[in-house]
UniProtKB/Swiss-Prot annotation:
It is a multi-pass membrane protein. Its main location: membrane. This is Taste receptor type 2 member 119. It comes from the Eukaryota. One of its GO terms (molecular function) is G protein-coupled receptor activity. InterPro entries: TAS2R (IPR007960). Residues 29-43, 103-124, 198-224, 278-335 are cytoplasmic. The chain crosses the membrane at residues 8-28, 44-64, 82-102, 125-145, 177-197, 225-245, 257-277. Residues 1-7, 65-81, 146-176, 246-256 are extracellular.
Length: 335
């Protein structure tokens, strides 16, 4: 029988999974449609597309791990593929790191020759950075192919057996490689984000001293800083918990262990929502999707109220009028 708190955490993980898949799925679909229509993809869109795709796969893995830890599926199935999960997680971290570097290069104002060089070339470097990340993660994983398959499996299975010993000293070096793989992108990301926050803070101070500065401009600047700060906090929490789990510093079945799983799943879902809210194109498409769903729901409810036998029939797609009637107005139908 599953304990009450484990059942609660499992339900929260499922909600995180659905939220993350919807948010990341929206990013993937919007950018894929643009690629089909225009036969090309902007550097930022390419980064978002790769990041969202890796996060969808990662959240599937997190959900499957939670099911295994809850004894709803055989944990050995996940243990046999835990190296793949590590690769996807590290790729996701690298893509998020390059996203932070891209924002820093495009937004920050730093009078340094190296930064100016990066600012001029970051758009052309994005595809190469993505390719380099894939090659780096793949090569570093398969250099120690046997150990990288045994160590994560040992860590995962140790959560189920009290007789399983912790990581052997012979694996201590390899464990440090795992931790280094998580730490390196975090250090690059932290430097980029701190430079960006410093630049935005200096710009905010200049705006305060300027006469006639518009309030919306200040609000947009504060929103950008909060968005970047939330990015940093989520990234940091995800990295810390991942390192803690790798070092087997948690007791399986405890509330702390379950909470750490929630933190790991929180990063790819919540940050994708932050990305949507901060990107005008994604935000516009998200609003269109929500309005369309509401209109379809209202139309189905009206049809069902008029004739319950028609409740199983599909509702045809609705088209907005020229004056863009809101969903609430469209739902006011004569009885």
């Amino acid at each position: 029988m599953m304990e009450g708190h484990m059942l609660f955490f499992l339900l929260v993980v499922v909600v995180q999974f659905l939220t993350g898949v919807l948010a990341n799925g929206l990013i993937v679909v919007v950018n894929a449609i643009d690629l089909i229509m225009w036969k090309k993809m902007a550097p930022l869109d390419l980064l978002l597309f790769c990041l969202a795709t890796s996060r969808i796969i990662l959240q599937l893995c997190i959900l499957f791990a939670q099911l295994g830890l809850s004894c709803l599926v055989r944990h050995t199935l996940f243990a046999d593929n835990v190296t793949f999960v590590y690769i996807i997680n590290e790729l996701s971290l690298w893509f998020a790191t390059w996203l932070g570097v891209f924002y820093c290069a495009k937004i920050a104002t730093i009078p340094h020759p190296l930064f100016l060089w990066l600012k001029m070339r970051i758009s052309r470097l994005v595809p190469w950075l993505i390719l380099a990340s894939v090659v780096y993660v793949t090569v570093t994983t398969f250099i120690h192919s046997r150990e990288t398959s045994e160590l994560p499996k040992q860590i995962f299975i140790s959560f189920f057996s009290k007789n399983t010993t912790r990581v052997r000293p012979a694996h201590a070096t390899l464990l440090s490689v795992f931790v280094f793989g998580l730490t390196l992108p975090f250090l690059i990301f932290t430097v980029a984000v701190l430079l960006l926050l410093s630049s935005l803070w200096n710009h905010s101070r200049q705006m305060r001293t300027m006469v006639g500065t518009r309030e919306p401009s200040r609000h947009a600047l504060v929103s950008a800083m909060l968005s970047i700060l939330s990015f940093l906090i989520l990234y940091l929490s995800h990295d810390m918990v991942a390192v803690l789990i790798c070092t087997q510093g948690l007791h399986f079945g405890s509330r702390t262990f379950a909470f750490c799983l929630l933190v790991i799943g929180m990063y790819p879902s919540l940050h994708s929502i932050v990305l949507i809210l901060g990107n005008p194109k994604l935000k516009r498409n998200a609003k269109t999707f929500i309005v369309h769903c509401k209109c379809c729901h209202c139309a189905r409810a009206w049809v069902t109220s008029r004739n319950p036998r028609l409740s199983d029939l599909p509702v045809p797609a609705t088209h907005h009028s020229a004056n863009k009637t809101s969903c609430s107005e469209a739902c006011i139908m004569p009885s």
